[in-house]
Amino acid sequence: TLYRRKSTMARKMKTMDGNTAAAHVSYAFTEVATIYPITPSSPMADYTDQWATQGRKNIFGNTVKLVELESEGGASGAFHGSLAAGALTTTYTASQGLLLMIPNMYKVAGELLPGVIDVSARALASHALSIFGDHQDIYACRQTGFAMLCSNSVQEVMDLGAVAHLAAIEGRVPFLHFFDGFRTSHEIQKVEVWDYEDLKEMCDMDAVAAFKKRALNPEHPVLHGSAQNPDIFFQVREACNPYYDAIPDLVEKYMNMVNAKIGTDYKPFNYVGAPDAEKVIIAMGSVCETIDETIDYMLAKGEKVGAIKVHLYRPFSAKHLLAVMPKSVKTISVIDRTKEPGSIGEPLYLDVVAALKGTEFESVKVLNGRYGLGSKNTTPADIFAIFANEDKAGFTVGIVDDVTNTSLPRIETANTAPAGTTSCKFWGLGADGTVGANKNSIKIIGDHTPMYAQAYFDYDSKKSGGVTTSHLRFGKTPIKSTYLIDKADFVACHCPAYMNKYDMVQDVKDGGTFLLNCEWSPEEVGNHIPGQAKRYMAEHNVKFYIIDGIKLGKEIGLGGRINTVLQSAFFKLANIIPEDEAIQYMKEKALASYAKKGDDVVQMNYQAIERGANEVVEVPVPAEWKDCKDEVLGEQAVSGKPEVLDFVNNIQKPINACQGDKLPVSTFKNVIDGTFPQGTAAYEKRGVAVDVPCWNSEGCLQCNQCAYVCPHAVIRPVVMNEEEKNNAPAGMKVTPMTGMPGYYFTMTVSVLDCTGCGSCTNVCPGNNRNDVLKMASLETQMDEQKFFEYGLTVSDKPEVLEKFKKGTVKGSQFVQPLLEFSGACAGCGETPYAKLITQICGDRMLIANATGCSSIWAGSSPSTPYTVNKAGKGPAWGNSLFEDNAEFGFGMKLAQDANRAALKNKLDEILASTDNADVKAAIDEYYATYEDGEANAKATD
C-alpha cells in the first residue's frame, strides 16, 4: 500500500521486537547512554549495555559508555551534562520516567544540543497506574522544544530511528523518537536491519565535529545556561526560530536519503488510500497499521477512504500535511491516543484544525476522537466505525460509553488481514514458559523461512501465575494487524484449569485446531470441559488434540516447565514448516540456550522436543456434542459486604473471565476515582497450582513455620474448642494442641489459592523425621478447600495469643493475616514480611506503597489482596509514584497528626463542659493511651 518499493540495497532480515530495533539504530549514533529502567522501555538500555559489554562499535568506531543513574531525573541530568560536554548522548524511557526528564528537556532544547530520547510511549498514572501503551507521556513533552518523530511499526522504528539521530546532529534540535509501548516495543516482527556502514554514510560528520567544537571545554571555555533579565530573555528565546523552521525540511531530506537507500517512501506525513478519498483519518502510532490494513480492504470494495500517518509531530509542519491531503476530502477524523480532561480537544486534533485554518481545506468537517488508552485494543471494526461516523465529535472507539455517550458502535465485518495469513493463539499461565516458547517459535519461522511473522503477548498484571495470551501471525506479506487475534487457525490451552474459566475454544476458526494440555485421557477429557466448548467444536469442525505436558515434564526432569513440550506439539499440528525441520531448529535453539548448563539439561530439552511431537493425541469429536448445553463458568459470590459483592460480581468476575473489554463505562460509576474495596482477591480461587501442600498431623511440631513463610497466606493454623472440633467437616484432620489442654490444632490449606511454590515443605522441621508436609496433586486435595473455609468460621482465641504471644513466630500465625492470595510470584520473598506486619498491627495500618513489584502484587485491578478482619478493619492502602513514596507516607502521617489533634481539641471542649463520669473516663483513657497505638485503638472501640 504505502512504503515498500523495490529496494535499492539488500538488508538482512531478522526477527526482533521494537525495543531491539530502536536499540540497534540508536547504538550506531550513541557515544554515551545515561539510563534508568522503566517498563516498557527497559530492554533498549539492556541491549545497549549488552552490546557495549560485547565490544560492539558504533559508527564512530567506539563502544558506547552506558551509565545507570538513580532515577530518570538523574538520567536526564547526566544526559544534559554529557551533551553539554560534547558526547552524542541517548537515553531510553517512558511514562512517569519521561515526566521526570521534562525539566532537563527544556534545557537541552534551549541549548540546541543534539540528544535523542527513545520512548516506548506509555500511559500516565492518574486514577490508576497503567504500564500499558498510549500517548499521554509524549504529549506532555510537546511544549519542551524537542522535535518529536513517531514510528508506527517495528520496521519503522528501525528505519526512522536513524532519521531522528541524523536530523538532530545536523539540525541542532534534540529529538524524542517514540513508538507505542508494548504494541510496538514488544511486538516481534520480521524486519530489514540497518548495516552500520550505511548509517555512517548518511551521517554529517562535519556537523558532528561542529557539535564537539561547541562543547564545554577548558581549552576554549564558554558559559552555558546563564541567568537572563527581562531586557533580553524574550529576544534570545525567539532567536532559535530558524533552527525549528528548518527541521521539517531537514527531516524530509533524511527521509529521502533513507528512501533512496532502501526503497521506501517515508515523508513527515504519509498518505495511504484512494486518490479521490472523501473520508480521511489522521493518526500516529501503531493504529496506523490497522488503519492501513482496513483501508486496503475498503478500497477493494470501491470505497473512497484514506489516512494520513503522522511521523513528524513536532515541529508540526502544516506545509507537509497539506501536501498529502487529498483535494476531494469532505470529512477528516483526527484520533488521539490520550485524554486531556477539560480541553476543547486533544493535541493532534487541535494541531490539525490550526493547520487547516486559512487554507482550501478550512471548510472541511473535522471530527475528533480518542482511542487506545492503556493499550485498549483497537480493531478494524473500530476503524470502520470511524469512517462511518458523519457528525459525532469528541467520540471514542473500543469502549461502550453509556454515561456521556461518546462511543461509536463497532462495525464488525469479515477478516481484513491479507489472504494466506495464518493466526495462532496460546493461552498460558504467567511464568510457565509459554511466552518464551512462542518467542522462540516466531524467531524460528521468521529466521528460517521466507514468511513474515508477528508475535504479540497480552498479559495481566500478576507477577506470575496470571493469564497470558500469545498472538502469532504468519504470512507471505508484511503483517499490519496491530490488534489482538479474535479468530485463530490454531488455539492452544496450556493450563487445563482455564477450560472452566474462559471461552477459548470459541477463538478457533471453522476447521481450525485446538490443543489442550491436560492429564485426562481421550475417553475422559469430555467429562472435564464445558458444554459450550464441546458444542462449538462439533458445530465448527474443530480438530481436537490433547497432550499431557505436565507428565512429560516430570518424566523428563523439567518439572513444571512444559513450554518446550508444547512448542514441539504446536509445530507438529500447525503445519507452518515441516515437522522435521522444526524439530531440528528447536534443538539448535535448545543447544544455544542451555549448553552452558551442561549436556544433561540439553538432552532433557531434546527429549521434550521429540516427545512433544510424538505424544500428541487426537480426540474424536462426536456428533452428539452438538447437543451439549451451556454451563456457567464461575459462580456468583454470595457472602460478604454488599459493596464488595457488587464489585466482585459486576467488575472483578467479568475482568477475570477476560471479558473486561465488554464492560461499559457505567459499570465503574462507583470507582471513578480509583477507589476499590479491600479483600477481593479472596474471591478469585484460581486453582493454578499443579501440586499443593498436604498436611499430616502425625509428627507435626505445631511450630507454624509453614504458615510463617507462605507467600500467599494459603496455609494457616486453626485452633478449635471441643464444640468446633465436633462440628468440623468429615475428614478434617484435627489433633490435640500442644501446650493448650482442651484445644485442638489443625493446619488448613486454601488449595485453590495456592501457587505450589513449596516454601512450606522446604521449611518444615517435621519433614526431617516424617512426611508432615508434602506436595500432592491439586486434584487429590480438593476436599482441603472446605476445611480451609470452615477454619475461617471458628472463633478467635485471645487465650491462645496470651499463651504464645503475637510477637513470636508461632504466636503471630494465630492472628488473621490481612494480606492474602496476592498476585506475587510463587515463592515470593517480599509478601511473607508484608503479611507478618499485617498480623502484628494490620488493623490500624495506613500503607504508602511505592510503584514497583510490591504495588503490582498488592494493587493490580481488580484483585485486592489486603483485606479486613471480622470487625471490618484492615490496612488502608495508597500509591503515589515511584520516586516520592517516603514523602507520600509522610503526608499521611501529617494528616493523621492533624486529624488526631483536631479530635483532641474537640475532646478538650467536651471534657470541660460535661459532668458525665462515663464520658470523662472514656476521654481520660483515650488521653492515657494516646502514644500507644494498640492500646489507643482499644480505647476508641
Predicted regions and their residues:
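Active-site cofactor/cluster-binding pocket
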Residues: 12-18, 315-316, 331, 335-346, ...
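Anionic-ligand anchoring segments at beta-strand to alpha-helix junctions in alpha/beta enzyme folds, i.e.
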Residues: 32-68, 261, 275-276, 280-311, ...
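A short, small-residue-rich loop immediately preceding and capping a beta-strand
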Residues: 32-35, 64-67, 82-100, 114-119, ...
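Conformationally flexible catalytic loops at phosphate/diphosphate-handling active centers
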Residues: 60-64, 175-270, 631
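Structural signature of the thiamine diphosphate
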Residues: 148-210, 365, 375-411, 604-626
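Thiamine diphosphate
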Residues: 252-400, 471-473, 484, 488-490, ...
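Ferredoxin-type iron-sulfur electron-transfer modules and their immediate structural context
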Residues: 582-583, 595-754, 761-846, 850-940
